[in-house]
A protein has these predicted regions:
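Residue-level signal for inorganic ion chemistry
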Residues: 15, 40, 130
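Extended accessory regions or peripheral subdomains of proteins
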Residues: 2-27
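Flexible, gly/pro- and Lys/Arg-enriched active-site loops
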Residues: 48-57, 68-168
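Short, surface-exposed acidic-centric catalytic microdomains
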Residues: 25-69
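Short, low-complexity, intrinsically disordered N-terminal peptides in bacterial proteins
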Residues: 1-6, 164-168
């Protein structure tokens, strides 16, 4: 890997229309980006955040190596969301597709448009479980904790049910 090649983790989520189809379309579109060696986690089914009255989500994590700068990757992810019908009406509301950059190498970014690592990742089993599945050696760039510990901590603190793995 060259110094311009950055390992990234991207979370996908959908709970409107045909969520499995939206995840597939998002993966297909991500494959067209400068995102090499792309791997996909299992698909998980999770309850909406904060017990909101909306359909359950399907979630998945993808990882790969990119040459894009973090802001460029964010713009590409937002363009994919828009093409797939994402409408931003309500925070944590239902959506056709949600695409979040979880990590960008071991970098930390805190800009008005992008926060990396994703600031809510440690509270979300639907991110932690697939991250452990496809990158079991991953280490949080701020805390230094491995993904295994982050997931153990979530399990010990959260009263939310674990997401259900739908497909390997």
């Amino acid at each position: 890997m060259t110094s311009n090649e950055i390992p990234v983790h991207i979370a996908l989520g959908s709970n409107l229309g045909n969520p499995e189809n939206f995840l597939e379309k998002a993966r297909e579109t991500l494959r067209k980006l400068p995102l090499e060696k792309m791997k996909c986690s299992s698909i998980l089914k999770s309850s909406p955040l904060l017990g909101m009255a909306q359909p359950d989500y399907l979630n998945q994590l993808v990882c790969g190596i990119t040459l894009l700068k973090a802001e460029e990757l964010l713009m590409e992810c937002q363009a994919i969301e828009k093409r797939l019908g994402r409408i931003r009406e309500q925070r944590w509301g239902p959506r056709t597709i949600d695409i979040d950059i979880i990590s960008y190498g071991q970098q930390t970014i805190d800009s008005s448009s992008l926060k990396i690592p994703h600031p809510e990742m440690e509270k979300r089993a639907f991110v932690l479980m697939p991250l452990q599945e496809i990158s079991p050696q991953w280490t949080h760039p701020v805390s230094g904790h491995r993904i295994e510990k982050l997931l153990e901590d979530w399990k010990s603190k959260s009263s939310e049910p674990l997401p259900v793995i739908l497909s390997p």
